[in-house]
Amino acid sequence: MSITITNPEGRNVEFKDQRGPTCGLYALSFVLEYLYDIKIPATADGDKTRESLRNRFKKDGKTVIGELYDATSSMADYIKALDPSKITCQSVACDVAAIIETLNGGGLCMVPFCVDASGKPDHSGIHAHWCVLLNVREVAGTAVACHWGQDHVFNLSQLEESNKAIKDVEEQYWGKIPAASYSFSIPIEGLNYVQCKTNTDTSCKCEYPLPFPIKSGSIKSIPAKPLSQTLAGKMLVFRNNGSCDENAVSQ
């Protein structure tokens, strides 16, 4: 599933379905093309010779399998370095006023939040996910948010609360299975990932009562992450005017 969004310059940009650990890279890929006409796909779809954000982030030690667990100033600087002549990115405190100011100025916000099963923000502290905020709606305090290849309308106060609720995560294990084997696996690079209970127990973390044909040697460990420090209370803002708001508080 995906949607096509026309930017102010008249370019059509596809926002692809982004689920599982690569959701942040899909969000970033959309932002770079929408604002700066920089076309770097989130993943290479199995072509190891093709440039992708996932390949670059892995090479530079910023991700294990494609997860983006960082909205700090160091990540903002890393993203800017992808193309310093074009990209304006800053880590700022996630609050309604900053979101509205950025969107009204023609920028975009990448906001981490806790997503529920329907795609809306919740306050569980778990299931950290990324959305891209596009523009403020006429209804006060709401904005268009893109994720999962769809556009949604989010209440910004609820989104801010959801962002601040993000909790730390324990060590995770992800293994590869043949593509399209199961509908609940996460497609990455031509194979599918499922979260395993441990690095040796290939039972699905979500308690599905099925054995998994895990590819030998494919299980990757994502270390425990202090998301309450690297994601909660923060967001990444992108502007197309080549300047950052001097009043914004860097995170």
Briefly describe each language-model feature range.
Residues S2-S91, K197, L231-G233:
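Cysteine-nucleophile protease catalytic domains, especially the papain-like/related folds used
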Residues T6, S91-C94, S216-K220:
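Short amphipathic alpha-helical surface micro-motifs
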Residues S29, E33, D37-K39, D60, ...:
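Generic signature of intrinsically disordered, low-complexity segments enriched in small/polar residues
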Residues E9, E51-E189:
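Conserved active-site-adjacent core of cysteine acyl-enzyme catalytic domains
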Residues M1-T4, C204-C206:
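Intrinsic low-complexity, intrinsically disordered segments enriched in polar/basic residues
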Residues K167-Q251:
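Low-complexity, Gly/Ser/Thr/Pro-rich intrinsically disordered linker/tail segments
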